[in-house]
Amino acid sequence: MCQLFALEAGAEEIRDQFRVNKVMMEISPRKQIEPTDNVPIIVGKQQERRLIESRWGLFPFWAKDSINADLDGVLTKEIFDRIIKKQRCIIPCTSVCKVEDDGKQKQSVSLTYKGSRLFGMAGLYEERVDPRGQVHRTCTIVTTAPGLGVEHHWKGLPVIISEDELEEWLDPGMREKNMWQSRFTPLHADHVSIKVEIEEPVKFTFQMLAGGRA
């Protein structure tokens, strides 16, 4: 699963890389993005491409497929049939992150893509209008099984949209969902860089525990 990611890039870099025509939200670089956070997503075919805001986690937020949607399930489950055909998006990202805890120590693991500092994760989005007419937009990250050398840290990784796949993925006119199965291959160790850092435990002093200054 992908439960944390970073986007350490600004609007101009995102616009240039993904050929965005209209930026419709403010963006500041973030080192940690979590489920239910608002995130930028890219939608629309060429000449109509927009960078818009969405909440990470499809309706309902507590559902199993809320923040991640396995590619096999997306292509076979009826619940995804409508949005995989015409509500695809790209979620820009600079690294995928996680925290591992074996009970003795914690370590943070981050994965970056060797092809580009900034890359696009395949996403699906949904829009609902409340009784007051306000639009609520949510999204999920499409994942697939990790490839050789990566499976030790992840059971599922985001599907990465290459530059060659960008136009077709964002074109709502491309509605043959089964074409995607053969297009996307798992990320192998030679595609990515993985960084592991041991998280230092906080050392409490008497003054800290008593509310004083260490």
For each predicted feature, which ranges?
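Short linear sequence motif anchored by a di-proline
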Residues: M1-A214
